[in-house]
Structures are given as structure tokens and as C-alpha cells.
């Protein structure tokens, strides 16, 4: 059971890289992070908020992110397995960190400070801006090395994740004649379980994702789209465990406005999320506890937010500061 758990963690660890194979690499990291202008670096720091002169100032530093590392891992793994949750995409990235970009808008280096030992992640690209290497260091010691190999069409074909332990983890990708990812296989060199992911499309849009272990279905994702291609419904089911139902609404500019999620079809278990520009989260209600979190922002001249005050049940809790440097 312990080995199986490790395998699943490895499987989802590589999911974020696998997104490149599904066409999510369109655009650069500036656009993925909702950044405007030619951003050179972003440094995020978090403090407890303190009231002063009808305003809020930085108090004692807060060492972790809005979510603790274990919660980030849990939510991130669920999302990588097929759960569509835009509030998760936003909140898991609000952590003490420093990110550097190249002039094409791609991340070259990232420091994460929300763990006991800070992590440094170095990104390397080829001449076509394909990510070919992602290496993580802890105290200057190599922790993981992720190597990505592309075919002549520029599609991700193979990924090798070296955890500097006994062996390597290997992912392989298969595409149809339209260039759509249809299968992703996962294996280790040792004689351990083989997983595979199957992707099904309709009119160029992903409508079904299935995850198999020993040819047994263990996870399923179903997706429905609107007239403009926007995601309007998503169902994610871990077989014999739980199911997430998600619905999304958009404004007149087709920008995400609201996200409504139910867990196990219970109106007492889920979330209601509202978004402003750049998909920045403004409202996050947890149904099971009726607990409301709100987020208010201050922007710089480029329109990027540089300060966020988080409120819990109307009480200011955290002061998030982003120092943004431009080319």
C-alpha cells in the first residue's frame, strides 16, 4: 500500500508538465499568471494584517501560503487528476516566493519559501520555448530533475522524472492525427503498477478524461462547454470515493465570474467562488462551515495587483505584498 501511495503521488507530480502536451502551453507564463506588461520578476511576501490610520499595514511575517503545504499538495493533486477548480489554481500560488522571467515571458527560476527548507527550481527551454528541463534544489542539493523530450512536431513525447532515489519515473505521450493528446502512460523501471490516462475529444475540446490502473478505471473527468468554447460544467469522480460537480458562469466579455462546486452532490459540502479581472479570486465561501473569505486588491500602474488583504468572516487577516519588477 505504501508503494502504491508513492506511485500515485509521482503520477500527479508530473501532471502539471503533462498539461503542456494538452495544448495548455499556448501563451507564456505572463499570461498564465495574469500578468500585464513585460514582467522581469515577482516577489511575494505574506504578513499578518494590522490596522493603522484607517488602513492596513504589514505586521508579523507569515511563513506559509494562504494554504499550508499539505493542503496545497492535496488540492493540487486533485486538480491534476481532473478536478477543475479555478479557486485552487489561484490560491495555491499565493505563497512566499520569488519568480524570475526571461524577456519572452517564461519562468527561468523560482524560489519557494513556504517550507522548512527553501526550494530553488530552475527551468530550461529550447529555441522554440519548449520546457526541456525542470530541476529542483534544496540547500544547493539536487532533489529532482525532470527532463522533457519532444517529437519533430513539437509535441511532448517523453518525460523522465529522476527523484535521485533508486530509479526513474517515465511518462510517454500519444497523439491523434489532429495533434490532440489521446493517451499518457506512466511507469517505473521497477516492476510496479502501470497507469494510463485516456483523453476523448469532441469538436477539438476535451470532454472525457479517464485514469486506469491495471486496466481498471479509478478516476473519471467529464467536461461540457458553451457556445464560445468556455467550460461551463465539469464532473470529476474518484471511483467508489467522491465526486465533484462544478458549474461556471461568465460575464459579457466571456471572463470567468462565478464557480459553484458541490462535493458528493450535497448542498452542504462545496464552495462558491467569485472572480474579478485576471481571474483574481474575490469571494470564497465554504458551504460545510458557512465560512466566508474575501480578497481585496491594490494595483500598480500596469494593472497588476501588488497588495491583497484577505478577510475571514469580515475580519482582516493577511497582508499579501507583490514586488513586481519590469524589463
Predicted regions span which residues?
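Buried hydrophobic residues that stabilize the cores of well-folded domains
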Residues: 22-327
Amino acid at each position: 500500500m505504501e508503494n502504491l501511495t508513492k506511485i500515485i503521488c509521482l503520477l500527479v507530480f508530473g501532471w502539471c508538465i503533462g498539461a503542456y502536451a494538452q495544448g495548455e502551453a499556448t501563451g507564456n507564463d505572463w499570461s498564465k499568471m495574469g500578468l500585464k506588461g513585460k514582467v522581469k520578476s515577482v516577489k511575494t511576501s505574506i504578513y499578518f494584517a494590522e490596522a493603522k490610520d484607517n488602513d492596513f499595514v504589514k505586521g508579523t511575517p507569515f511563513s506559509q501560503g494562504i494554504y499550508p503545504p499539505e493542503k496545497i499538495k492535496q488540492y493540487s493533486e486533485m486538480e491534476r487528476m481532473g478536478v477543475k477548480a479555478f479557486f485552487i489554481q489561484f490560491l495555491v500560488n499565493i505563497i512566499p516566493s520569488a519568480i524570475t522571467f526571461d524577456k519572452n515571458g517564461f519562468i527561468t527560476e523560482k524560489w519557494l519559501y513556504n517550507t522548512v527548507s527553501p526550494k530553488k527550481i530552475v527551468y530550461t527551454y529550447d529555441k522554440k520555448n519548449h520546457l526541456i528541463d525542470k530541476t529542483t534544489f534544496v540547500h544547493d542539493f539536487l532533489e529532482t530533475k525532470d527532463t522533457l523530450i519532444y517529437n519533430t512536431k513539437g509535441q511532448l513525447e517523453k518525460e523522465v522524472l529522476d527523484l535521485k532515489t533508486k530509479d526513474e519515473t517515465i511518462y510517454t505521450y500519444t497523439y491523434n492525427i489532429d495533434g490532440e493528446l489521446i493517451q499518457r502512460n506512466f511507469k517505473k523501471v521497477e516492476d510496479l503498477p502501470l497507469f494510463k490516462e485516456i483523453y476523448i475529444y469532441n469538436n477539438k475540446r476535451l470532454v472525457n478524461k479517464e485514469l486506469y490502473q491495471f486496466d481498471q478505471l479509478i478516476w473519471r473527468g467529464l467536461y461540457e462547454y458553451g457556445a464560445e468554447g468556455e467550460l461551463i460544467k465539469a464532473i470529476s469522480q474518484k471511483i467508489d470515493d467522491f465526486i465533484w460537480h462544478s458549474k461556471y458562469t461568465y460575464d459579457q466579455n466571456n471572463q470567468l465570474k462565478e464557480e459553484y462546486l458541490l462535493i458528493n452532490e450535497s448542498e452542504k459540502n462545496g464552495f462558491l467562488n467569485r472572480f474579478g479581472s485576471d481571474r483574481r479570486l474575490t469571494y470564497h465561501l465554504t458551504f460545510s462551515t458557512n465560512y466566508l473569505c474575501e480578497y481585496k486588491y491594490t494595483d500598480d500602474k500596469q494593472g497588476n495587483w501588488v497588495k491583497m488583504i484577505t478577510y475571514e468572516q469580515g475580519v482582516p487577516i493577511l497582508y499579501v505584498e507583490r514586488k513586481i519588477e519590469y524589463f
